[in-house]
UniProtKB/Swiss-Prot annotation:
Reactions catalysed according to its record: a lipid A disaccharide + ATP = a lipid IVA + ADP + H(+)
Role, per record: Transfers the gamma-phosphate of ATP to the 4'-position of a tetraacyldisaccharide 1-phosphate intermediate (termed DS-1-P) to form tetraacyldisaccharide 1,4'-bis-phosphate (lipid IVA).
EC number: 2.7.1.130
Gene name of this polypeptide: lpxK
Protein name: Tetraacyldisaccharide 4'-kinase
Binding, ATP: 57-64
Domain of life: Bacteria
One GO BP annotation of this record: lipopolysaccharide core region biosynthetic process
Pathway noted in the entry: Glycolipid biosynthesis; lipid IV(A) biosynthesis; lipid IV(A) from (3R)-3-hydroxytetradecanoyl-[acyl-carrier-protein] and UDP-N-acetyl-alpha-D-glucosamine: step 6/6
GO cellular component, one term: plasma membrane
GO molecular function ontology, one term from the record: tetraacyldisaccharide 4'-kinase activity
Keywords: ATP-binding, Kinase, Lipid A biosynthesis, Lipid biosynthesis, Lipid metabolism, Nucleotide-binding, Transferase
Family from the record: Belongs to the LpxK family.
């Protein structure tokens, strides 16, 4: 069966069948965006600066690692950041603040990973302005908010918009959802404040006419054992054996290519993005490698030889300086 992400890489008969739905979707997006620009619908000002990090394409683009980098960087600059997120894949129906007992099933895998890797307060909720209000009420010390995957949530006022692109996949076949991966038209990128292209495995990045973009390299760090997170090994130290590489992320081929670049022999197994892992999905006694995003859902039933690979993005110096100037820090 042809999966949607694969469908989005080319234009075929099924693409053409979906075009009427895609045009209808694109029209709704355009009208809604226009309503906010003209003031027919109003944005909510939460009283402190909001940085929105998102993308105009569906699927993985490296957005979550950039949110983690940005949140940690803001703290290094003397800010006290907090994060709001939709909590995709979680069951929470109201605004929920993440804590030590939070699970991916409740709040979503990406917010849980952000919280654990930054230590920043994180609130998830379908209503972004409401989530931001809860965050401010519970953490009055927060002086700046990072909105995870919030580019299309126009109701939340924002001081800065950052769009993230995957340099390898770009805009796919260029069609709107569901015929293609576009949540919004390409021209939306000319309205945001900055565009970051995430480059995996030292690959090339793309040049788009009239569009200024910065580069951020997607890098693999150490691997850590799920049952004993304090036990860490360089990724190349795992190259002496074959692994089952299992992941439920938007662009699994990027993870597999990264393992290959580090000489790690593996059998790839891709699950749907945000997959809710169960104990019988993977061999309990096998040697398994996964991403950190997957690990937050597997820690409770991990086998003794299951490991998670630290993944991070490192933006180029020019982007960091631009960001520092824009924020006045």
């Amino acid at each position: 069966m042809l999966s949607l992400p694969r469908l989005w890489t080319h234009t075929g008969p099924l693409t053409l069948l979906l075009l009427p739905v895609a045009w209808f979707f694109a029209s709704l997006v355009t009208v809604r965006r226009l309503a906010f620009r003209r003031g027919w619908l109003t944005r909510v000002d939460v009283g402190i600066p909001v940085i929105v990090v998102g993308n105009i394409t569906a699927g993985g683009s490296g957005k979550t690692p950039l949110v983690i980098w940005l949140t940690n960087w803001l703290r290094e600059q003397g800010h006290r950041p907090g994060v709001v997120s939709r909590g995709y894949g979680g069951k929470a129906r109201r605004c929920v603040e993440l804590g030590a007992e939070s699970t991916a099933a409740e709040v979503g895998d990406e917010p849980l990973l952000i919280h654990r890797k930054t230590g920043a307060p994180v609130v998830v909720g379908r209503d972004r302005p409401a989530a931001a209000r809860v965050l401010r009420a519970r953490h009055p010390e927060v002086d700046i908010i990072v909105s995870d995957d919030g580019l299309q949530h126009y109701r939340l006022g924002r001081a800065l918009e950052l769009a993230v692109l995957d340099a390898a996949t770009g805009f796919g076949n260029g069609w709107p959802l569901p015929a293609g991966p576009l949540r919004e038209p390409f021209r939306r990128l000319h309205e945001v404040d900055g565009v970051v292209q995430v480059v995996r495995g030292g690959g090339a990045w793309r040049t788009y006419l009239g569009l200024k973009t910065w580069r951020a390299d997607y890098r693999a760090g150490d691997a850590r054992r799920l049952r004993a997170p304090e036990e860490r090994k360089p990724l190349r130290a795992l190259a002496q054996r074959e692994w089952l590489a299992a992941t439920g992320i938007g662009r699994p081929e990027g993870f597999f290519a990264m393992l290959e670049a580090h000489g790690v022999r593996h059998r790839p197994r891709a699950f749907p993005d945000h997959h809710a892992f169960r104990p019988d999905d993977l061999p309990a006694g096998g040697a398994v490698l996964m991403t950190e995003k997957d690990a937050v859902k597997c820690a409770d039933f991990a086998g003794p030889d299951w490991w998670a690979v630290d993944l991070e993005v490192v933006p180029e110096a020019g982007f960091v300086e631009w960001l520092r100037t824009r924020l006045g820090s």
